[in-house]
């Protein structure tokens, strides 16, 4: 009952509860933390931390890798899958992506092959199909880990193409929530489609940081679109 009351008081999280898997994981975070963060980006981080480390630690299970170290390998895997527009990937391809990251956290080559099944068995964050293909338990986790990877590594991103592509929109929202979203919003304004401007409007609410001049330019654009002949633009504004 306490959890339901907390969710009702956090509109940014209540929409997530329609998915049974996400609701279960939200309940797990609430159980181990005693409270819920107020932002989606913080909730996803907490879920990953609980699943990849704290849950096992609470049960007294020894783990050779910390949650942070596991993410070092999982984040580039998620990013590569997003860039390939994949929801599942073969074990050989996955290990090729994660080989160097796993070495960087001192996982020996002969031990690396057990990483995927270990993550599945210990956290459920990854799932293996009957055909031996691997996928993240929910697209949300693939998107979140991709956004975290981009945010942490600061690599040049293809905003100009992605802002008008719905496949990338949730990744970009989550990226904005933990980064300076100025370049992203500028790309949305330059594209000037309803889809791109809708993404930019979301960034107004979720961005960790956004330059004042770009924020004002977007607000002025949305105000101007109130008089647009396009009903979709008027609705967005």
What role is predicted for each listed range?
Residues 1-25, 46, 114-115:
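Amphipathic alpha-helical segments of the small helical/lid subdomains adjacent to P-loop NTPase cores
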Residues 2-3, 12, 43, 93, ...:
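Exposed alpha-helical structural elements
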Residues 6-11, 60-64, 112, 129, ...:
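Active-site-adjacent structural elements in folded domains
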Residues 8-18, 35, 63-72, 136, ...:
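Structural motif
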Residues 17-22, 26, 47, 140, ...:
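Solvent-exposed aromatic/hydrophobic patches embedded in short alpha-helical segments
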Residues 20, 144-237:
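Hydrophobic repeat-domain scaffold segments
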Residues 27, 78, 99, 172-176, ...:
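Amphipathic alpha-helical segments within well-ordered protein domains
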Residues 31-37, 41, 45-146, 151-154:
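Extended helical regulatory/linker subdomains that flank P-loop NTPase cores
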């Amino acid at each position: 009952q306490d959890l339901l009351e907390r969710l009702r008081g956090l509109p940014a999280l209540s929409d997530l509860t329609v998915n049974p898997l996400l609701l279960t994981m939200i309940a797990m975070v609430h159980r181990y933390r005693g409270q819920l963060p107020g932002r989606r980006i913080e909730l996803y981080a907490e879920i990953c931390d609980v699943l990849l480390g704290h849950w096992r630690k609470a049960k007294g299970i020894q783990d050779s890798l910390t949650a942070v170290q596991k993410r070092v390998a999982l984040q580039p895997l998620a990013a590569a899958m997003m860039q390939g527009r994949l929801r599942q990937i073969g074990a050989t391809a996955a290990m090729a992506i994660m080989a160097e990251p796993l070495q960087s956290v001192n996982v020996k080559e002969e031990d690396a092959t057990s990483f995927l099944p270990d993550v599945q068995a210990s956290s459920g964050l990854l799932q293996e199909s009957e055909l031996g293909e691997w996928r993240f338990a929910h697209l949300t986790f693939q998107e979140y880990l991709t956004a975290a990877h981009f945010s942490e590594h600061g690599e040049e991103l293809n905003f100009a193409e992605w802002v008008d592509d719905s496949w990338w929109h949730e990744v970009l929202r989550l990226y904005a929530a933990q980064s300076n979203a100025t370049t992203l919003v500028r790309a949305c304004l330059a594209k000037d489609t309803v889809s791109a401007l809708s993404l930019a409007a979301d960034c107004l609410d979720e961005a960790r940081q956004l330059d004042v001049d770009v924020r004002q330019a977007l607000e002025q654009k949305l105000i101007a679109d109130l008089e647009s002949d396009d009903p979709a633009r008027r609705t967005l504004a």
